[in-house]
Each structure stands twice: as structure tokens, then as C-alpha cells.
Amino acid sequence: MIGRIAGTLIEKNPPHLLVDCHGVGYEVDVPMSTFYNLPAVGQPVTLLTQLIVREDAHLLYGFGTASERNTFRELIKITGIGARMALAVLSGMSVPELAQAITLQEAGRLTRIPGIGKKTAERLLLELKGKLGAELGHVPGTPAVPDSAVDVLNALLALGYSEKEAAAAIKQVPAGTGVSDGIKLALKALSKA
């Protein structure tokens, strides 16, 4: 297993890199979030990596942070999500944004990523619920979402309200409110809208 690579960045062509490590050039694919933070060609670079061995190829994927690599590893465990699709997900949104989308069960945000349809987005939400969101928390600058708010959101979605309507209604519910009272207050807010 190759867990990390450090060398000189020889070539950048999104999403591919060529990293010279003691005279050996390694081809590494990276998500765009990592690509945008790379140094200039000719400069030293260090990446955390994940080696994928297939029957026809050995593929090396690189990441700027441990959270990106851990998220990639969780994504490729999901049936129907290969390394390329996982890379597309990480290129489409940051890890904290993905964690928030999963915590809030926002399939609509995931379907904006090229190659992710409604069914794939729902599978991602189902498979990663409790894994990614719990591990990574919330997006900095936004309030943390308590479990009761997620339960209220899921209840409103089950009643047929859109994600946008449900999220707006939950904002009207005071923090620390229980699930049952939260649903009542959210429904009251929705009836006034």
C-alpha cells in the first residue's frame, strides 16, 4: 500500500498529476479540491494516497487532507460508487459540505454533482448517514444540527414537504426543542407560509 507520496510536481493536467519521487514518475489522480491547492510545477508536493488495484491497472489517488482520503475510502465502499465517481463527488463539493448534505439528508445538493442521479444520491445518503456527518460535524460558520432537527426534517420530508420548505420551517423551531414539539412547531410555521 502506498499511503503517502512526496516529491516534485512535474505535470498538472486536471485531474491528473505526475509526481517525481527519486527519479520515478507517479501518475496520481486528485479531486479538484486538492488540485486547486497544489503548488506550481517544479515545486515540492506531498499527498496522502490511496492505491486501487484492479485486474487491468494499479491506480493511485492523491489527497491534500486526511479527511478527503477518509471520505474517498467511505465512498468507494458503496455499491455502484467507483473511484472515478468518488473523485467526482469530492470535486463537486468539499468534505464539510458533503457531511452537511448527508446530515441534513439533502439529495438535491448531491444531484448537482455531474454523474450523480437521484437514485445514486439517495444511496449515498443512506450508506453514509451516521458515518460521514457524525465524523466530520458541520460546516464552519453554520449552526450545528442536533439529531432532533434531523428527525424533524425527515418527518417533514415524509409528509411531502420539499427540502427547501422543511429547512425553512426548522429554522423557526427553537434550539433544544424535542422531536414531537419540533414537528408541531415546524408544521405551524409551514401553515403560516
Swiss-Prot record:
A GO MF annotation of the entry reads:
four-way junction DNA binding
Q: Which portions of the sequence form the region Domain I?
A: 1-64
Q: Name one GO biological process term.
A: DNA repair
**Top-level taxon in the UniProt lineage:** Bacteria
Pfam families membership = HHH_5, RuvA_C, RuvA_N
Q: Which GO terms describe its cellular component?
A: cytoplasm; Holliday junction helicase complex; Holliday junction resolvase complex
Q: Which InterPro entries does the UniProt entry name for this protein?
A: DNA_helicase_Holl-junc_RuvA_I, Hlx-hairpin-Hlx_DNA-bd_motif, NA-bd_OB-fold, RuvA, RuvA_2-like, RuvA_C, RuvA_C_sf
Q: What keywords are annotated for this sequence in UniProt?
A: Cytoplasm, DNA damage, DNA recombination, DNA repair, DNA-binding
Region of interest called Flexible linker, as start-end residue ranges on this chain: 144-151
User: Region labeled Domain III — which residues?
Assistant: 151-193
User: Where is the region Domain II?
Assistant: 65-143
Query: Where located?
Result: Cytoplasm
Q: Could you give the subunit structure recorded for this chain?
A: Homotetramer. Forms an RuvA(8)-RuvB(12)-Holliday junction (HJ) complex. HJ DNA is sandwiched between 2 RuvA tetramers; dsDNA enters through RuvA and exits via RuvB. An RuvB hexamer assembles on each DNA strand where it exits the tetramer. Each RuvB hexamer is contacted by two RuvA subunits (via domain III) on 2 adjacent RuvB subunits; this complex drives branch migration. In the full resolvosome a probable DNA-RuvA(4)-RuvB(12)-RuvC(2) complex forms which resolves the HJ.
What's the family?
Belongs to the RuvA family.
Stated role = The RuvA-RuvB-RuvC complex processes Holliday junction (HJ) DNA during genetic recombination and DNA repair, while the RuvA-RuvB complex plays an important role in the rescue of blocked DNA replication forks via replication fork reversal (RFR). RuvA specifically binds to HJ cruciform DNA, conferring on it an open structure. The RuvB hexamer acts as an ATP-dependent pump, pulling dsDNA into and through the RuvAB complex. HJ branch migration allows RuvC to scan DNA until it finds its consensus sequence, where it cleaves and resolves the cruciform DNA.
Q: What is known of its domains?
A: Has three domains with a flexible linker between the domains II and III and assumes an 'L' shape. Domain III is highly mobile and contacts RuvB.
The protein's name in its UniProt record? Holliday junction branch migration complex subunit RuvA
- Origin species: Cupriavidus necator (strain ATCC 17699 / DSM 428 / KCTC 22496 / NCIMB 10442 / H16 / Stanier 337) (Ralstonia eutropha)
